[in-house]
Regions:
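Bacterial Sec-dependent N-terminal signal peptides
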Residues: 1-23
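Acidic, histidine-bearing metal-coordination/catalytic regions of metal-dependent phosphoesterases
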Residues: 21-133
Length: 133
């Protein structure tokens, strides 16, 4: 009886370890960036690269006293013709910025596991720290 219990515990531990390691292997990461490109007086393009095909977006807020994480911010998606791009290279052009004003931003990527027609299956997220510019 003791052997059966030990065997069952070892089996469950092995399965849990395998599943955890598979989850860690499959997580998406942002490998490069974010970089500011084509900075104008009232616009900027934010570019970053991921290790897996994904959709991407930027959360942007004006520089303030409160924590960036305290509330939700508008999302600016990497799109073409209104459709979210699935890529490893992401670029989001943010318009309507006020000259001389500082902004805080953070980039995100969500892995696209499968994209068939209008059916999209998403995977895990990756994000950066908050940047001040």
């Amino acid at each position: 009886m003791i052997r059966k219990i030990i065997f069952l515990e070892m089996l469950l531990l092995g399965i849990a370890t395998f599943l955890y390691s598979q989850d860690e292997i499959s997580k998406i990461t942002i490998t490069h960036g974010p970089y500011l490109q084509n900075v104008g007086s009232n616009e900027a393009t934010i570019v970053w690269i991921t290790d897996k095909p994904s959709i991407g977006w930027v959360e942007l807020a004006s520089d303030g006293n409160g924590s960036f994480y305290a509330k939700e911010h508008p999302r600016y998606f990497d799109t073409s013709n209104g459709i979210k791009n699935t890529s490893t290279i992401h670029a989001v052009k943010v318009k309507g910025l006020t000259p001389g004003k500082q902004y805080r931003y953070r980039v995100f990527a969500q892995e696209v596991l499968k994209h068939t027609g209008y059916k999209i299956i998403y995977g895990s997220y990756a994000s950066t720290d908050v940047y001040y510019r």
